[in-house]
From Swiss-Prot:
It comes from Thermus thermophilus (strain ATCC BAA-163 / DSM 7039 / HB27). Belongs to the class I-like SAM-binding methyltransferase superfamily. TrmB family. PANTHER family: 3-DEOXY-D-MANNO-OCTULOSONIC-ACID TRANSFERASE/TRNA GUANINE-N 7 - -METHYLTRANSFERASE (PTHR23417), PENTACOTRIPEPTIDE-REPEAT REGION OF PRORP DOMAIN-CONTAINING PROTEIN (PTHR23417:SF14). One of its GO terms (molecular function) is tRNA (guanine(46)-N7)-methyltransferase activity. The gene is trmB. The keyword Signal does not apply. The keyword Chloroplast does not apply. The active site is at D103. One of its GO terms (cellular component) is tRNA methyltransferase complex. This is tRNA (guanine-N(7)-)-methyltransferase. Keywords: Methyltransferase, S-adenosyl-L-methionine, Transferase, tRNA processing. InterPro entries: SAM-dependent_MTases_sf, tRNA_(Gua-N-7)_MeTrfase_Trmb, tRNA_methyltr_TrmB_bact.
């Protein structure tokens, strides 16, 4: 029920890979505690519901809810919605996207963090089927008007402003704000045409490591070291010494994806191994390979020499 990108056999996956069957595909971005997700899955058992949520606590609560209710047509992803849209949905296969009460980022200097911007609508058009739609429900009029303008700027959608469906007002926060007498806004953004710019998925790699000759250094002074990468940034947070070498807790940020993973430097039968630990099922991307490359550079500065490079 929980989608872990690194464990998927096919990349990007097909609907059959995720759900074990075909059916109308719906993506909910920001499902919170999952009560709307569960209601949707119950009311439309023929639909296949993929949810994306950044809060780990919310994902856990929603996962428990789905299991408790035995909802086999739901899959949950812990991470950002645009990542799921880009990498877990094939082009032209998505029937609907649902966004209920997104973070409005009300301050002007934060508006670039809003989800429903022109670039998102353009990319969304590559994943929606012809006639597919995005449904937005919000209590923030400024955000609502902003989203309408951003979608209109693309020329790719027909926008229909409608009363919000009752089911969309039964989320955790909607119920709270309904009692407070707030006004709600709802619109359907229906795809008319597709943006010509391709939006390929992230490239996933099987390995990211190097073998080096030489002796392990006595220490690695890497704590809280940030490294700029072509694809983002890596931060070496902590270094722990073990019997065989070092473990480096590393934070990697790239577009729509943040990972905390372990890199390891240890003795092996063929020399010194430096690479990604499989602990936690990290997704090996260009940025992760860049983090390993930065670690290897530090080892080279200690006098080790690369004899095999898969970074």
């Amino acid at each position: 029920m929980l989608v872990v990108p690194a464990r998927l056999h096919r990349w990007p996956p097909e609907v059959q890979d995720l759900f074990g069957r075909e059916g109308p595909l719906v993506l909910e971005i920001g499902f919170g505690d999952g009560r709307f997700t569960a209601e949707l899955a119950r009311s439309r058992p023929d639909w296949l519901v993929l949810g994306a949520e950044v809060s780990a606590a919310s994902v856990l609560r929603a996962l428990r809810r789905m299991r408790r209710e035995g909802l086999a047509n739901v899959r949950l992803y812990h991470g950002q919605g645009p990542f799921a849209l880009r990498n877990l949905v094939l082009p032209g296969t998505l029937d609907q996207v649902i966004v209920n009460f997104p973070d409005p980022w009300p301050k002007k200097r934060h508006q670039e963090r809003r989800l429903l911007r022109e670039a998102f609508f353009r990319r969304l058009s590559t994943r929606l089927k012809s006639g597919g739609s995005l449904l937005l429900t919000t209590d923030h009029e400024g955000y609502f008007r902003f989203a309408l303008e951003e979608a209109e700027r693309t020329g790719l959608y027909r926008v229909e402003v409608r009363p919000p469906p009752e089911a969309h007002l039964r989320t955790k926060y909607a119920l709270k704000w309904k009692e407070a007498g707030r006004t709600f806004f709802h619109a359907a953004f229906i795809k008319l045409r597709e943006d010509p710019a391709p939006w390929p998925p992230l490239r996933r790699y099987d390995v990211a490591h190097a073998l080096l000759s030489g002796e392990l250094p006595q220490d690695l002074a890497l704590e809280k070291t940030a490294v700029r990468l072509k694809e983002g940034v890596a931060v070496f947070l902590e270094v722990a010494r073990g019997k065989e070498g070092f473990y480096v807790l590393t934070h990697v940020e790239e577009e729509d994806l943040t990972q905390d993973l372990l890199l390891e430097v240890r003795k092996s039968a063929r020399g010194v191994y430096a690479g990604v630990s499989r602990f936690g099922s990290p997704l090996i991307t260009e940025a992760v390979k860049g983090a390993v490359r930065a670690l290897v550079d530090r080892l080279e500065a200690h006098g080790l020499e690369v004899v095999q490079d898969h970074t």
